[in-house]
Amino acid sequence: MTTIDLSVKRRLQESVDEDKGKLIDLLSRLIRIPSDNPPGSTVEIAHFIKDYLEGWGFEPRLYEPNKGNVNVVASWGEGSPHLILNGHLDQFPAEVGEKWSVPPYSGEVKNGFVWGRGSGDMKGGLSSLIHCFCATSKQGLPGKLTLTCTSDEETGGRWGALWLLDNVPGITGDSVLSGEPSGGTVRIGEKGMIAFTVKTRGKPAHGSFAGYAGENAIMKMGRLLPEIEALRNITASLTPEEKVLTEELMKGYTAQFGHEAEGLAGVLTHVTVNIGIIRGGVKANIVPAECEVEVDMRVPIGVSPSQLKATLTERLRGIDLSASVDYSRHPSTILGATYSPPNSIITNVTRDNAKLVTGIEPFLSFTSGGTDCRFWRERGVPAVAYGPKVYAMGAADERVPVEDLASTAKVHMGMIVDFLTKKSK
């Protein structure tokens, strides 16, 4: 990196403190636009971001491949290197009856935090990406920077990141920076996801004849549930390199979750199975004709979705031939665990800048949740997440520390400069 590059980087990082009020205001304004998923409409927030970017002189493009699922794309520069900034617009809903200290869509700034639904997941990181995208555009940096604001990350990404990659030229890039909350770590990967519904069928009859007439679909389901739960016992097959990587990632997990990490550690290396919803029957005195359960399964490194799906089908058919399985999300959004090389350029510039800004060497980490990054990784593009700490994510009093929001923006500024200048040489 030249002296000029260092000067640009230092100036941009110092500007975060000068413009902290603008950064906080942008986050508050994003929070005040509900983008709950469900129902999933990002129309209003997408148009707000479009107007904001136009105020900086950009010509952002809106894409609405499915009604209400609006995505925003903007770019500056040209050629290579090409860095993609990625954040999602949708968020978990604020549930009726949640006990908030402030109105959930207020974006209130209080006690050193910006409060509100979506502040952490992920409007805090998104506001930093937007702010840095705009600020770095005026510095004469080489290469190209593209901002992607996607519509449906919370429900699988079919109409957001996946659709953009499949249909819009210039979205792939050389590497990806996501602003997802990462708890001070550099998140290089994530577990895979499989969501499915199992249904059993019986024969209705009057409840007074139970055991003598009809077939109870709920009882059939009861025999299947242990087999579904037992999928968590499938063991991962790891290469020596994957074993070393997993050990490193466990350190990052501890850094993220502190004292809770010991009890949660197995999440990274095992299949998890959550039987989250069960429905069956219409009345207590009628033998139920149908029963269904909705299941969320997360897949670690070393286990493939196809392996799990085949095992599930085999086990269910062995007990009840009438049982059916429906995979809730579009097949193209069901992927195994994905991760980026620990020594990729984007990983290294993230670690370097996080240490520069915070004074702490960040661990690499993995998430048990799902992000848009997986779609780029599946295409061989390194993708990492670095975003502000979040308290009570997805719950009452979700909030982001103001100082962490600012330090995240400084890291993002440095990453953009370093990636575009280092990769261009």
Predicted regions and their residues:
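Metal-dependent amide/peptide-bond hydrolase catalytic core
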Residues: 1-7, 35, 66, 195-425
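Structural motif
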Residues: 81-84, 113, 146, 174-176, ...
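Acidic/His- and Gly-rich active-site-bordering loop/insert found
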Residues: 2-115, 138-142
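Acidic/histidine-rich catalytic neighborhood of metal-dependent amide-processing enzymes
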Residues: 122-195, 265, 424
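Short beta-strand segments
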Residues: 86-87, 148-150, 177-180, 199-201, ...
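Acidic-glycine-rich active-site phosphate/pyrophosphate-binding loop
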Residues: 94-109, 188-200, 352, 384
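Predominant activation on well-ordered alpha-helical scaffold segments within soluble catalytic domains
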Residues: 28, 50, 127-130, 134, ...
